[in-house]
Amino acid sequence: MTELNKLTVADSVKGLKNKDFTSKELVNAHIKQIEKYKNLNAYVTETFDLALKQAEEADQNYAQNKARTLEGIPFAVKDLFCTKGIRTTACSNILKNFIPHYESSVTKNIFDKGGVMLGKTNMDEFAMGSTNITSCFGNVISPWKANDDNSDLVPGGSSGGSAAAVSGFMASAALGSDTGGSVRQPASFTGLVGFKPTYGRCSRYGMVSFASSLDQAGIFTRSVLDSSIMLEAMMGFDEKDSTSINAKVPELQSAIGSSMKNMKIGVPLSLGEGGIIEHDIMKMWHDTIELLKNAGAEIVDITLPHAKYGVAVYYVIAPAEAASNLSRYDGVRYGLRVEYENMTLDEMYEMTRSAGFGEEVKRRIMLGTYVLSSNCMDAYYFKAQKVRRLVANDFNNAFTKVNAILLPTAPSAAFKIGEKQNDPTIMYLNDLFTIPASLAGLPCVSVPAGLSARGLPLGMQIIGKQLDEYNVLKVASTIETGVKHIKFEPAGF
């Protein structure tokens, strides 16, 4: 039998229902794996006692035929979802000992369906980063290695801990957040399915904010079916979140394996021009186009003329919102406070924020403050908002002709830790293909679609219309089936 911690969510549910094993056994298998691979630094807070208690309750529910959708399934939580009574830090020194008094809506939804929490995962500080090297707890190491080099690789970011946990079989699934690609890009780097739903599908209540108009909860799984199961549990209207969409949660599992007949897939190949994409990625893109064509889909050439400005727009709007959101961390109400005798209030603010925030967060606060200044607001912030609307209009126009859009998740495979660290602009280009869909608030997924020449996983991204998670999953499932001969599993795990 497959090792328990290697089972998918769907297979775990099936095994628990059939009483092939207990939830406690399933959880203990994951705890053993977490203990074995502590060096990867995927978790920053372990909640094993809670997990075993929840597993016992799950086993009782199975015994009494009262099992819920995710009864007894062990999952991990990115450390920016507030968990009542459990440390939540956003991996920043300024929140290092913060313990919330309330539960985020997304984690509550999963608990209400029977989920078992193994712990909180590492991340880039305040979700700002693409490599998980800005965490105050240290960087995360990917479970993957290249076949020609034993160097440690980045897991992607900002949800790198969640990606490493699921890829390294330390969780069946893991919550992440996606602002400009923070679920999709790590999923591509670690051979996982990473789904970001339509903006507003998942409540932001209890999520530590980065950029409020872009932040959205997402999920890492090892199969497209698992993604559909977790999404059904996570999504739903929440009156505590003013941006929450009051729409019925769709039944998504029937999308898996459904026919591609009459499906039109848009392909913006012009976005790959200019030598920005590695050869392996370009080959995977063309191979996936052929795969979908052979599955019965119609391939349509489209253009997204303003998508190339997405990164520039994002790095005006997101830092501006971050500068506003992070102004609440001042040492007065909660979190870190630096103080000494005869200190003025202004000095306390300055010293606390200087000591509490890391370099990347400071950089983005400075950038955001600058673009919101009276001299620059028209030239940068308002102009960026106008271009954001043009990016959204490009997608709206494309979706009059197609059901979904296909493009790579990232321009490269995972790279060595520290390799691109000294040039923030090169780092920011990691999100070149993920940012446009975030600006438009569209549902999208990264699904493993190939391996590089160095044996590293590569992801394809599928983007759908607003609220059309169903068709996104349908296309992802077709790709998954088409590449099932490839083993997306790190060596030695």
From Swiss-Prot:
NCBIfam families: gatA (TIGR00132). Gene3D superfamilies: Amidase signature (AS) domain. The keyword Lyase does not apply. Its EC number is 6.3.5.7. The gene is gatA. This is Glutamyl-tRNA(Gln) amidotransferase subunit A. The keyword Ligase applies. It catalyses: L-glutamyl-tRNA(Gln) + L-glutamine + ATP + H2O = L-glutaminyl-tRNA(Gln) + L-glutamate + ADP + phosphate + H(+). Belongs to the amidase family. GatA subfamily. It comes from Rickettsia typhi (strain ATCC VR-144 / Wilmington). The lineage of its organism: Bacteria, Pseudomonadati, Pseudomonadota, Alphaproteobacteria, Rickettsiales.
